[in-house]
Amino acid sequence: MKIIRVQDQIEGGKIAFTLLKDSLAKGAKTLGLATGSSPISFYQEMVKSRLDFSDLTSINLDEYVGLSVESDQSYDYFMRQNLFNAKPFKKNYLPNGLATDVEAEAKRYDQIIAEHPIDFQVLGIGRNGHIGFNEPGTSFEEETHVVDLQESTIEANSRFFTSIDDVPKQAISMGIASIMKSKMIVLLAFGQEKADAIKGMVFGPITEDLPASILQKHDHVIVIVDEAAASQLD
């Protein structure tokens, strides 16, 4: 695991984009993408660039259960607004949050991941150490699955909704085993509220109580953090 410290989120996005360009030059064809505030500066760099992504495939980590793609809080909407509308890909995959059978949808998504091995996976990290929507206690062997979101995650995401009561209580998420199959992982974390999770991920025991700790076992992980998020690493 390599740690890169940056001044702020803007610099973090630039460095992540440089890593992406290197990966594309080596033949990367499938990107694993994340939502939330952490990757936004990275997506801004992609949008500003002259690179053409029309031969690439993207696979997103997760989607809320119960939100249509037209909901402005769906991750499908987020990705279109922040990246896909400006930079079309050959194919974009996200879980279907309105699937009538969400368990079958999870299995369908695993098949997509199997058919499109991820070359470059972007991650954020939750305050409780979750990656994707893999909450503490999630088995490291889990593949795509339906998640009951923890109260801390619902609270953290409530800032994007009119009311905390409007935050979906479930999501479909790529599993930890799925994430670990990615050839390269770039995790972005900014802000003091991520410091405890980053410390546990880097130095703590590998435990399902802190899902991101499994990344210690991955061969190619780069963690991009600002000084606040890195404040407990010294």
UniProtKB/Swiss-Prot annotation:
Its EC number is 3.5.99.6. One of its GO terms (molecular function) is identical protein binding. Keywords: Carbohydrate metabolism, Hydrolase. Pfam families: Glucosamine_iso. The active site is at 62 (proton acceptor), 128 (for ring-opening step), 130 (proton acceptor), 135 (for ring-opening step). Pathway: Amino-sugar metabolism; N-acetylneuraminate degradation; D-fructose 6-phosphate from N-acetylneuraminate: step 5/5. GO terms for cellular component: cytoplasm. InterPro entries: Glc/Gal-6P_isomerase, Glucosamine6P_isomerase, Glucosamine6P_isomerase_CS, NagB/RpiA_transferase-like. PROSITE patterns: GLC_GALNAC_ISOMERASE (PS01161). This is Glucosamine-6-phosphate deaminase.
